[in-house]
């Protein structure tokens, strides 16, 4: 029988059940336990899923069965558990964003590299079959010269979403739409279109009074590939519609809606194109109408990849170093909105954007 890979989860909030279910449904993954600074919350989740509630992170890391630590803490609290886990020789998977600054992200990458452990990130939209088809077409040059890479996320979150947990209404915790929801789709543009050269953004709050966060963003990106990008993000647009990702080149256009390939047209039609047009699964909820309206299947692919990477000795498919450029774009968007002018990349950290 193949040896299982034990997982420990740090953080017992809204996202923890996604990790628990994903690990349980994986081949070779096993949930050892969960830790949260709220012992009551950890105990509730542990009881529901029949796993151990650790009293501290140190206790979790002292359990030799835990080989991988999944960090599911609030956005601004990823650094410490990642570094501690790495120093204890554990592989790490962190929720997005890796951190709220480039400096902390680099510190975490360095800690994992020094410890010789794998360090992956849940930007799980990358693993969707429609996205992988787009990626393959970009890399093979099938689009020709890239002209546009656009993301439209028109979602809805009620006021209660932001008031349900203290950190969700705090700007410094990365609870605005750009980080909390939009990060995934900015990541897809970076993943598909490549390095960004400059950004320009406007951020406002149009639907959640009394919350000091942006819930609506319109931005323009310029990529080294020559492509232009338009990004529209909102959690104020009831009832919420599926995300739309569009890639346009001189020789073709691909559009993903939700996780389904909506448009796949190229000047050089190929036999496999009809099958690609059928990619996706409309049955998985994609989060448009509420935080709970999301499936965990994409999380499971990332979990399964870590299990397989450990077994085979290879790197994970989404190492955090590949997500750092996305964080840089996101931070540049905040800087642009604050300065009310375009920002050229690369950038340096500016903590005042969270004031």
Feature names for model-found ranges:
Residues 1-49:
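N-terminal Rossmann-like dinucleotide-binding module
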Residues 19, 49-111:
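Beta-loop-alpha module in the N-terminal Rossmann-like domain of NAD(P)-dependent dehydrogenases
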Residues 110-118, 132-147, 248-249, 253:
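Basic phosphate/pyrophosphate-binding loop/patch that engages nucleotide-derived ligands
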Residues 55, 71, 93-94, 119-121, ...:
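Hydrophobic residues in well-ordered beta-strands that form the structural core
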Residues 117, 144-148, 335-355:
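C-terminal capping/lid region of NAD(P)-dependent oxidoreductase domains
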Residues 246, 250-321, 343, 348-355:
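C-terminal glycine/acidic-rich active-site capping loop/insertion
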């Amino acid at each position: 029988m193949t040896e299982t890979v034990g997982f420990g989860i740090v953080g017992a909030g809204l996202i923890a059940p996604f990790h628990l279910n994903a690990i349980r449904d994986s081949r070779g993954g096993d949930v050892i336990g969960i830790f949260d600074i709220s012992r009551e919350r950890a105990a509730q989740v542990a009881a529901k899923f029949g796993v151990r509630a650790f009293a501290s992170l140190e206790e979790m890391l002292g359990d030799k069965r835990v080989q991988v630590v999944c960090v599911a803490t609030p956005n601004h609290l990823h650094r410490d558990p990642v570094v501690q886990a790495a120093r204890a020789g554990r592989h790490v998977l962190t929720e997005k964003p890796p951190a709220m600054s480039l400096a902390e992200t680099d510190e975490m990458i360095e800690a994992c590299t020094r410890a010789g452990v794998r360090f992956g990130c849940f930007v799980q939209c990358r693993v969707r079959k429609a996205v992988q088809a787009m990626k393959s077409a970009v890399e093979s040059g099938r689009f020709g010269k890239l002209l546009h890479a656009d993301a439209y996320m028109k979602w809805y979150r009620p006021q209660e979403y932001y008031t349900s947990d203290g950190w969700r209404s705090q700007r410094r915790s990365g609870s605005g739409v750009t980080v909390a929801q939009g990060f995934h789709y900015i990541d897809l543009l970076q993943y598909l279109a490549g390095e960004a050269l400059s950004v320009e953004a406007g951020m406002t709050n149009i639907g959640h009074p009394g919350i000091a966060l942006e819930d609506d963003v319109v931005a323009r990106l310029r990529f080294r590939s020559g492509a232009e990008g338009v990004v529209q993000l909102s959690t104020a647009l009831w009832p919420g519609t599926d995300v739309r990702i569009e890639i346009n080149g001189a020789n073709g256009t691909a559009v993903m809606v939700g996780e389904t390939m909506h448009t796949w047209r190229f000047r050089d039609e190929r036999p496999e194109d009809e099958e690609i047009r059928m990619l996706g699964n409309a049955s998985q909820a994609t989060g448009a109408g509420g935080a709970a309206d999301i499936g965990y299947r994409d999380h499971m692919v990332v979990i399964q990849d870590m299990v397989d990477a450990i077994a085979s000795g290879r790197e994970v498919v989404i190492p955090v170093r590949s997500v750092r450029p996305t964080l840089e774009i996101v931070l540049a968007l905040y800087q642009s909105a604050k300065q009310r002018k375009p920002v050229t990349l690369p950038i340096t950290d500016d903590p005042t954007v969270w004031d």
